[in-house]
Amino acid sequence: MKKILFLCLLVSVLSWSCSESKRKINESVVDFEQDSLAGNAALPKVTFYQYEDSSNFPDAILELYTPLGNQVFRPGKVPFEFNIKNFSYFGEVSQNPKLFLIFNGGDRIGFFSPIFQRELTEGTYRVAAYLVDEDGYSLKSFGNYIDRDFMVGESRAFPYSAEPYIALNLPTNEQTLLLGEELIIDFLVLGGDMKLDELKVQIAVNDFKYEVDHMAPVRVANLPLGEYKVNVKLMRTDGKELEGPFSAVVKTVYIR
């Protein structure tokens, strides 16, 4: 009996230690603005927060050999060839892909191999490619991600722009979460540095708003049942909006 009590105590201590190893930062509790919810004191407050930075695989490198910049392909199967370095986790057997691509600000698409083909129709494409950790969150160190513009068929290149833009790993469009689950907003900023370029990311989940000044997953707790528009926008710290087509992403999320 004493052994059982000791083991239970040990498990509790270890669980507490693990939870304490991740410290919440930038926590923001948001009051309800909707009349139907504002008067319900029993509802827990919607809370945005992040965990302290703990960058995984900072030495992992993702290289893109094909397509080349502004390369033109015929409609149909377009080849992609990546080279992945210092990321042994990619070679492990898993049911979850470690390499993801986002085409023109759409939902992420996972791949198990660094060499593959993708069926694409005529158009101009910007692909953001990145590696993810064991939890499916994008790696955010320099070299963990890469982007490239290319064309399929009779299409024109994107107008030149030196503006940074955003790629949204999570959530995916029409993602459904159970009541009590946290909404994870995981993004990458490409073509710029949030500190050096004085950038911030503004997040709006319906009427609930939050801002961050660095790349780290944002967690939203205590969302009530309903449908939510998740608007993630990259902008200057002085409030000036960027003009590029991929500076903002909108997804629909359901809490059931």
Descriptions of predicted regions:
Residues 73-80, 85, 177-186:
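Short coil/turn motif common to extracellular beta-sandwich-like domains
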Residues 105-113, 207-215:
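Short beta-strand segments within Ig-like beta-sandwich modules, predominantly Fibronectin type-III
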Residues 118-124, 220-229:
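Surface-exposed, short loops/turns at beta-strand junctions within beta-sandwich domains
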Residues 132-141, 210, 235-243:
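Short acidic/polar inter-strand loop motif in beta-rich domains
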